[in-house]
C-alpha cells in the first residue's frame, strides 16, 4: 500500500485543498449526490438516476447510498482521490483508445469491480475523442432489454448477491483536473493492481441503466414508452473500458443541463410526433401470420399505446380519420308501421321526414315547452343520400310494387336492378342489425371494381351468374348514407372547423339557407322571416347538448390502427394478405373541395358500388370477410385524392359523367323517400350545387293499408330494410294519397343518379332499456291529414268505424312485451280486430303484466294514469292544434334490475307522444287554412278526438285497478304503495270487487295464456275459451259513454 501513498503525495496541494473543501461541504449536508461539478447546475438531483444507458447525465454512475457514511476523510489504505464507478468490463480497445498514462490491470475483468482513478480521469477529460465501443457492454445491454426489468427489480436482485466489505471514499469529481497531476504509468498501474487485489467492491444499482419493464410488469408503462423512444435519439458512443458513453461533439460543458424524466419524456414524445408526421416513412416489416400467432409483436403494441398518449396529450390530429359520411342501419326495435326507421348513433334514430313533422317539434319547443316531457327529444333534420340507376328505373320499380301490393308473394320478392354493365344484382332486404359503419364519400380516379380485382385477382375468375346468386343471398342491400357536407345546418362549429377553413361561411346547400328561399307557398312565408327560420330551421333549439353529442359520436375521428388488446393478430394477417404495411392504415391524404370540383372523377356511386362489390365477393373468398378489408378499401378512397381538406364540394357529384360507362356493381334505391308537402319545395335539395329534376308533391305516410295480410317474423313483426322497404312505403302512398307528379321531396341527380331526401333525427327511446316493451296506440277519431285525397278520406273513415277508433278514440297498432324469456308481439292487423270492452282491456292489462305477479300491474297503473292526466291537461290547452294520426307509445323495460336506481326507473312505464306527420299547429291553420283540402271544422278549439282516446285509456286502466284492489283509491306515492303491498302480503290475499281472494304475489291466469290462445276461439262467443273466461268478460265488458259530438271527428 506504499505505492498508494506515493501517488497520493504527488497530488498538488491545490487539489488537496479542493478535496478538503468538498468534504467540509458534504459534512454540512450540502452535497448528497454524486454530480459533475463541471456542470453549472444548482438543482439537486433525485436519488435515482433515470435514463437508458445512464445517458441522461454524462453516463456517470453513483452509489445508491449517496456515500454518506464516510465523511471523515480519505482512508489511508485507499489513499487515492478517486470515486466509485461500476460495470468496468474487459477492455477490447486498441492502445490508442486509452491514454498512455492509464492501463487497467487484467484483474478488472470482473464487471462488478472498477477503477476509481479511471473514473476521475475520465471526468476531467470527457471531451477527449470517443473510445471504441465495448462489445461486452453492448451485449449485456441487449440482455437487459430482453429481460425488461424495472430499476426496482434490479435493485432487489442485487440486494441478494454476495456482499463484501467496501472501503469507500468520500471524494467527489473535481471541477478542474490537469493531466499533469496524474501519476506515471507504471506507478499508477501498480497501485491499481494493489487495490483490485485487496478490495472487492459491491455492485451498485445506480450504475445500471433502467431497462424495459418485464411483460408481467404493467406498472411502468410510461417508463417503457420513454425507453422505446430513446432509440430514436442519436446515441453517444460507449467507452469500452468503463462502460461510460462519451458525449457528442456538439456538447458544451457550460450550457449542458440535465434532463429530468418528465422533460426527457416530453421531448421524446414531441420528437416522435414530428417523425411520424413525415410522410416518407421507412417500410415496416409485416411478419407472417403464423409467426404473429406464435409471438405477438409487442413493439408495435408499445408504439400504438404511445401514439394514443400522444394524441391525448399533444392534441395531434394528423393521423385521425374524420369520416365524411356514415351509413344508416335498420332499427330493430320498431313496432309495426310502414315507415322505415334507421339507427344513426347509439343515442339517436332517424326516419323519413313526412310533411311538417319537424315544424311541429320546433313549434312545440318555442311555444309549448311543457309538452316536451311527453315527446322524444328532437335533434334536427338530415339530408340523406342514396344512389339509383336512374329516375325512370326508380319510378318503374315504384309502379311494379304499387301494382302488386295486394300480392303477398311480392313483398318478399327481390327486385332486380339492371346496370349499364349488364350485371344484375338481386338485393335482399333482411335487416342486419350491425353497428354503425363509417365510410368515406370520396370518388375514385379508377373503377372500384378494377382496384379490388387488382388487389384480389381471384375475384375475376368468378362467373357473373355466380356473383348474382351470391348477391341474392343473405347480404343486405345498400343502405342510405349521411354526408357531412350536406348537413352543415346541424353540425356544431366545434366539429365543422375540422373539415373546413371557413366554418362560419353560410352553407348554400343546407336546410337552413334553402328553407327560406323556396318559391311555393309554405306555412311560414306569410309571416315573419325570422319566425319562419326559428320554426323551420332543421335543428333543435332546446336539445343542443344532445345534438352535439350525437354528431360528435357519429363523425368522431377514427384511428385505423391495431388495438392493444384486440385483433392484433388479425391485423397482421390481413396486412400480409393485402400486401400492405401497418402504416398504410394510418396515412391519409385529403382533397380540398376546390380541387375535387375541378377534377373529373367518379361519383359517390362508385364508392357505393365498391362497398357492394366487397360485400358480395366476401362470399366468394372467406378470407375477405373481415372489417379490415373494408377499412383498407375505404382508405384507398381517401388516399386517391390529394389536398389539405376533407370537405367535398357537392358540385363534383354532377360534373362527372364517368358513372355511365364505368363498372358499377350496386346502385340501389334509397329508403330515404321523405314526403314533404308541396309548400315545402326546395327546403333541402334545392341549392346552387344541385341539378334537380324533382317533381312537386306530397307523400302522406300512413301506418295503415287496405291489405289485411302481413309477413311476420318469429315474434310477429315484419322488419323491412333497404330498397323493398321504401318502395312499399312509396307504393302505398302513391296509390292512396298522391300521384307521381306530386313527388317533390325526392331529388334526382341525373348525372350521379343520386336520390337526396330528408330524414328527421330523434332520440332513441330504447337506449337505456335491456328488454324494451312497447304498446303503440293510434290516437284520435281522425287519422288523415288536411291534404288527403278523397279516396284516402273515405278509407280512413271506414277504418275508424270498424275499429275502436271511432268509439274510444284509440286503437291498438302494435304490441311488444317481454314474457320472462321471450317476446309476445302483435301487429296492427291484430289491433284492428280488437273489440271495445273486455278485449281492449285484456290487451292493455297484458302489456303491463310482467308474467310473474299481479303486483306489476298494481304498481304501473297509478303511474300511467298520472301521466295521462297531465297529458290531457296539456293537450286541452292546445287550442287550434290538431294531432291527426298521432300516436301514444307506452314503453318500459321488461328486464330491468330493480336494485339499480337507473334500471328501476326504466322499469316504470313512460308515455311518449309520437308521429306528427299530419299534425297541424295553430300557426299552420291561421296561415294556410284556405289551402287545406280538408281543414278542421272548428279550428279554434282543442282536438277532441285525441282527448277522447286519452279518457278511454284512463277508463280501462281504472277498471282494472278497481277489480284488483276492490275499488281502493289510486295510490301515487311510492311509500304508500309499498305499505299497501306489504299489508296485502301479511294478509296473504286481497278481496276483489267480486268477492274473490286476490294475492298480489300470484299470477293472473286470464293473462298467462294470452299468447297461446287461438284467435278464432277468442272471437267465438260459444267456444270453450270464452266460456272459461266468462267472469272476466262480464267484469270488463264496459265502455265509456260519450256524447256523439260532431266536433269529435273534425
From Swiss-Prot:
Catalytic activity, EC: 2.7.4.21
The record's annotation in InterPro entries points to: IPK (IPR005522), IPK_sf (IPR038286)
> Top enzyme class of this protein?
transferase
Keywords from the named record: ATP-binding, Cytoplasm, Kinase, Nucleotide-binding, Phosphoprotein, Transferase
Q: Where in the cell is it found?
A: Cytoplasm
Q: Pfam families recorded for this chain?
A: IPK
Q: Where is the composition biased (Acidic residues)?
A: 307-316
Q: What is the deletion mutant like? A: Resistance to wortmannin.
- For the ligand (substrate), the binding residues are 772-780
Task: Quote the function comment for this protein.
Answer: Converts inositol hexakisphosphate (InsP6) to diphosphoinositol pentakisphosphate (InsP7/PP-InsP5). Involved in phosphate regulation and polyphosphate accumulation. Required for resistance to salt stress, cell wall integrity, vacuole morphogenesis, and telomere maintenance.
Report what the protein is called: Inositol hexakisphosphate kinase 1
Q: Which organism does this sequence originate in?
A: Saccharomyces cerevisiae (strain ATCC 204508 / S288c) (Baker's yeast)
Name the gene behind this protein: KCS1
Amino acid at each position: 500500500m506504499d505505492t498508494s501513498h506515493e501517488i497520493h503525495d504527488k497530488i498538488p496541494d491545490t487539489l488537496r485543498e479542493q478535496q478538503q473543501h468538498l468534504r467540509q461541504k458534504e459534512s454540512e449536508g450540502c452535497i448528497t449526490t454524486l454530480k459533475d461539478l463541471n456542470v453549472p447546475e444548482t438543482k439537486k438531483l433525485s436519488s435515482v438516476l433515470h435514463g437508458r444507458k445512464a445517458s441522461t447525465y454524462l453516463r456517470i454512475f453513483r452509489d445508491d447510498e449517496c456515500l454518506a457514511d464516510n465523511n471523515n476523510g480519505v482512508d489511508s489504505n485507499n489513499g487515492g482521490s478517486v470515486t466509485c464507478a461500476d460495470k468496468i468490463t474487459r477492455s477490447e480497445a486498441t492502445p490508442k483508445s486509452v491514454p498512455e498514462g492509464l492501463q487497467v490491470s487484467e484483474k478488472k475483468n470482473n464487471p462488478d469491480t472498477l477503477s476509481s482513478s479511471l473514473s476521475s480521469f475520465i471526468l476531467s477529460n470527457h471531451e477527449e475523442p470517443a473510445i471504441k465501443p465495448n462489445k461486452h457492454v453492448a451485449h449485456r445491454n441487449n440482455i437487459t432489454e430482453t429481460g425488461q426489468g424495472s430499476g426496482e427489480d434490479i435493485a432487489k436482485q442485487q440486494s441478494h448477491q454476495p456482499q463484501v466489505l467496501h472501503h469507500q471514499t468520500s471524494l467527489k469529481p473535481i471541477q478542474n483536473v490537469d493531466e499533469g497531476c496524474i501519476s506515471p504509468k507504471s506507478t499508477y498501474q501498480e497501485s491499481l493492481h494493489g487495490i483490485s487485489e485487496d478490495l472487492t467492491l459491491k455492485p451498485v444499482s445506480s450504475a445500471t441503466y433502467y431497462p424495459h419493464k418485464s411483460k408481467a410488469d404493467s406498472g411502468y408503462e410510461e417508463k417503457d414508452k420513454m425507453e422505446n423512444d430513446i432509440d430514436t435519439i442519436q446515441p453517444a458512443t460507449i467507452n469500452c473500458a468503463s462502460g461510460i458513453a462519451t458525449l457528442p461533439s456538439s456538447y458544451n460543458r457550460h450550457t449542458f443541463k440535465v434532463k429530468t424524466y418528465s422533460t426527457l419524456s416530453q421531448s421524446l414524445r414531441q420528437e416522435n410526433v414530428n417523425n411520424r408526421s413525415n410522410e416518407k416513412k421507412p417500410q415496416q416489416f409485416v411478419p407472417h401470420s403464423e409467426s404473429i400467432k406464435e409471438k405477438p409483436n409487442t413493439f408495435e403494441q408499445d408504439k400504438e399505446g404511445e401514439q394514443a398518449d400522444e394524441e391525448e396529450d399533444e392534441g395531434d390530429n394528423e393521423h385521425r380519420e374524420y369520416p365524411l359520411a356514415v351509413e344508416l342501419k335498420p332499427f330493430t326495435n320498431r313496432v309495426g308501421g310502414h315507415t322505415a326507421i334507421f339507427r344513426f348513433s347509439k343515442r339517436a334514430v332517424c326516419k323519413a321526414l313526412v310533411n311538417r313533422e319537424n315544424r311541429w317539434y320546433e313549434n312545440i319547443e318555442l311555444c309549448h315547452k311543457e309538452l316536451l316531457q311527453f315527446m322524444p327529444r328532437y335533434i334536427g333534420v338530415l339530408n340523406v343520400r342514396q344512389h339509383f340507376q336512374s329516375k325512370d328505373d326508380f319510378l318503374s320499380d315504384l309502379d311494379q310494387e304499387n301494382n302488386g301490393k295486394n300480392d303477398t308473394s311480392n313483398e318478399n320478392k327481390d327486385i332486380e336492378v339492371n346496370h349499364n354493365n349488364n350485371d344484375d344484382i338481386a338485393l335482399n332486404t333482411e335487416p342486419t342489425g350491425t353497428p354503425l359503419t363509417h365510410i368515406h364519400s370520396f370518388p375514385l380516379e379508377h373503377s372500384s371494381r378494377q382496384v379490388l380485382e387488382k388487389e384480389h385477382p381471384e375475384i375475376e375468375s368468378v362467373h357473373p351468374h355466380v356473383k348474382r346468386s351470391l348477391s341474392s343471398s343473405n347480404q343486405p342491400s345498400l343502405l342510405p348514407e349521411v354526408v357531412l357536407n350536406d348537413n352543415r345546418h346541424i353540425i356544431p362549429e366545434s366539429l365543422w372547423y375540422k373539415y373546413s377553413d371557413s366554418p362560419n361561411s353560410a352553407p348554400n346547400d343546407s336546410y337552413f339557407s334553402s328553407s327560406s328561399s323556396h318559391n311555393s307557398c309554405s306555412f311560414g312565408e306569410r309571416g315573419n322571416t325570422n319566425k319562419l327560420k326559428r320554426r323551420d330551421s332543421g335543428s333543435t333549439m332546446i336539445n343542443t347538448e344532445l345534438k352535439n353529442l350525437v354528431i360528435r359520436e357519429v363523425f368522431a375521428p377514427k384511428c385505423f390502427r391495431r388495438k392493444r388488446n384486440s385483433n392484433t393478430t388479425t391485423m397482421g394477417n390481413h396486412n400480409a394478405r393485402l400486401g400492405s404495411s401497418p402504416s398504410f392504415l394510418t396515412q391519409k391524404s385529403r382533397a380540398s373541395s376546390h380541387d375535387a370540383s375541378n377534377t373529373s372523377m367518379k361519383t359517390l356511386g362508385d364508392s357505393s358500388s365498391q362497398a357492394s362489390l366487397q360485400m358480395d365477393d366476401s362470399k366468394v373468398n372467406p378470407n375477405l370477410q373481415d372489417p379490415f378489408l373494408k377499412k383498407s378499401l375505404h382508405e384507398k378512397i381517401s388516399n386517391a385524392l390529394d389536398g389539405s381538406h376533407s370537405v367535398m364540394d357537392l358540385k363534383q357529384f354532377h360534373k362527372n359523367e364517368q358513372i355511365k360507362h364505368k363498372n358499377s356493381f350496386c346502385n340501389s334505391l334509397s329508403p330515404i323517400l321523405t314526403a314533404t308537402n308541396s309548400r315545402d319545395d326546395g327546403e333541402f335539395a334545392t341549392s346552387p350545387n344541385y341539378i334537380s329534376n324533382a317533381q312537386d308533391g306530397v307523400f302522406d305516410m300512413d301506418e295503415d293499408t287496405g291489405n289485411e295480410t302481413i309477413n311476420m317474423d318469429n315474434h310477429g313483426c315484419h322488419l323491412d330494410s333497404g330498397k323493398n322497404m321504401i318502395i312499399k312505403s312509396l307504393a302505398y302512398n302513391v296509390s292512396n294519397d298522391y300521384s307521381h307528379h306530386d313527388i317533390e321531396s325526392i331529388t334526382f341527380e341525373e348525372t350521379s343518379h343520386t336520390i337526396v331526401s330528408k330524414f328527421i333525427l330523434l332520440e332513441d327511446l330504447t337506449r337505456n332499456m335491456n328488454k324494451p316493451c312497447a304498446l303503440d296506440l293510434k290516437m284520435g277519431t281522425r287519422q288523415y291529414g288536411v291534404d288527403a285525397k278523397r279516396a284516402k278520406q273515405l278509407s280512413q273513415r271506414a277504418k275508424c268505424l270498424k275499429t275502436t277508433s271511432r268509439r274510444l278514440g284509440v286503437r291498438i297498432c302494435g304490441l311488444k312485451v317481454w314474457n320472462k324469456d321471450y317476446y309476445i308481439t302483435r301487429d296492427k292487423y291484430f289491433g284492428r280486430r280488437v273489440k271495445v270492452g273486455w278485449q281492449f282491456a285484456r290487451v292493455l292489462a297484458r302489456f303491463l303484466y310482467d308474467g310473474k305477479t299481479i303486483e306489476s300491474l298494481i304498481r304501473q297503473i297509478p303511474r300511467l294514469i298520472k301521466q295521462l292526466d297531465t297529458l290531457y291537461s296539456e293537450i286541452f290547452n292546445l287550442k287550434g292544434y290538431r294531432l291527426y294520426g298521432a300516436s301514444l307509445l307506452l314503453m318500459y323495460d321488461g328486464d330491468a334490475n330493480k336494485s339499480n336506481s337507473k334500471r328501476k326507473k326504466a322499469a316504470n312505464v313512460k308515455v311518449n307522444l309520437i308521429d306528427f306527420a299530419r299534425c297541424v299547429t295553430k300557426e299552420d291553420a291561421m296561415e294556410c287554412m284556405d289551402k287545406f283540402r280538408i281543414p278542421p271544422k272548428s279550428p279554434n278549439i282543442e282536438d277532441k278526438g285525441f282527448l277522447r282516446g286519452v279518457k278511454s285509456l284512463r277508463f280501462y286502466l281504472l277498471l282494472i285497478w278497481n277489480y284488483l284492489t276492490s275499488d281502493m283509491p289510486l295510490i301515487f306515492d311510492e311509500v304508500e304503495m309499498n305499505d299497501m303491498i306489504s299489508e296485502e302480503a301479511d294478509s296473504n290475499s286481497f278481496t276483489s270487487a267480486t268477492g274473490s281472494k286476490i294475492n298480489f304475489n300470484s299470477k293472473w291466469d286470464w293473462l298467462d295464456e294470452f299468447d297461446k290462445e287461438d284467435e278464432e276461439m277468442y272471437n267465438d262467443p260459444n267456444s270453450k275459451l270464452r266460456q272459461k273466461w266468462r267472469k272476466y268478460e262480464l267484469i270488463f265488458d264496459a265502455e265509456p259513454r260519450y256524447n256523439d259530438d260532431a266536433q269529435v271527428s273534425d
